[in-house]
Amino acid sequence: MRRSSLISLPLLLISASLFAAPAEVKVAVLQNKLDHPWALAFLPQDQGMLITLKGGQLKRWQPGKGLSDPIVGVPKVWDSGQGGLLDVALAPDFATSRRVWLSYAEAGDDGKAGTAVGYGRLSDDNTRLEAFRVVFRQQPKLSTGNHFGGRLVFDGKGYLFIGLGENNQRPTAQDLDKLQGKVVRLTEDGAVPDDNPFVKTKEARPEIWSYGIRNPQGMAMNPWSNTLWLNEHGPRGGDEINIPERGKNYGWPLATHGINYSGLPIPEAKGETVAGTEPPLFVWKKSPALSGMAFYNSDVFPQWKDKLFIGALKDKDVIVLNVSGNSVTEEGRILGDRNQRVRDVRVGPDGYLYVLTDESDGQLLKVSPSRE
């Protein structure tokens, strides 16, 4: 499935600084003193939310009660560089299973690490994660501290998608015998589906759904087209939005709009577009350092309808994209005046936008339009 927006791709490469001033929003600080929070997930029935802290703690936040003590039973994480405790997601059947999924950096035997994913049962009193089971390990373990990815998305059809970085080992994103630089697809129990694209490909990892990805930091289901969307960090320039489809190659490091941090070209790169690879849906020439993303699919604030919100770590704001089907038509910014790295963005069951800032004194923010 190709995107009509690609016809006007050069128009999408304009620097973000050329867009209009940030829209006015109202911001409430719900929690201070979060030590590098990474992700949040809403619990049902007004029970608050779960928040991961990069250092390895999972906590519960409730209105009027604040932050809990650390939840017991979280696996040991490799807290180094960009590694640590990463995403959190509730199983689709959480109401009966109480299953909570986590992604995290896991140490290997040689001082390197990779992304691992597993789940446990959240106790009825929300204080313990019981019988934690690891169902996925990124192999081989290659990271010395970079590019873990780690976002978790259930598609509503019985499958879990995991975004995986290439551990700063560029060529591995093209290697089908390695799990670096991939999107993988599992069942809701952690098994490999029989219809994954490379199940019958000799020496390929059967978990792989798509490949050629650098460092995905945000991932979400588009509720209007029912497609998986992913954002990923480019190197120096070339942050992208992609729609990872079955068996397709998204180019890294062969195709990129970025260069090395040194200013030199990426050695493996053959151009911005390369035959046999998928062009991105949207590209930033100047990298915002994209992070968590959320589609606004609520009727609470009509002015936000059909918007996609993406956090930006380097630019320290939230990017707002207007979405029509599988195309992006316009961009704006909010929260830039706060000067905080934005790590995660979620739409709450109440229709408000919830934002985590990635600082040693990180915050949980509740955001709404200034004119509700």
What are these model-derived regions, one by one?
Residues 213, 328-349:
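Conserved blade-ending motifs and adjacent loop-strand segments that build the rim/top face
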Residues 20-170, 218-221, 226-234, 286-324, ...:
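Acidic, Gly/Ser/Thr-rich repeat motifs that build Ca2+-stabilized beta-propeller blades
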Residues 1-9:
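Bacterial N-terminal signal peptides that target proteins for export
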Residues 115-125, 176-189, 244-245:
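Beta-propeller blade signature
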Residues 8-17:
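Bacterial N-terminal signal peptides
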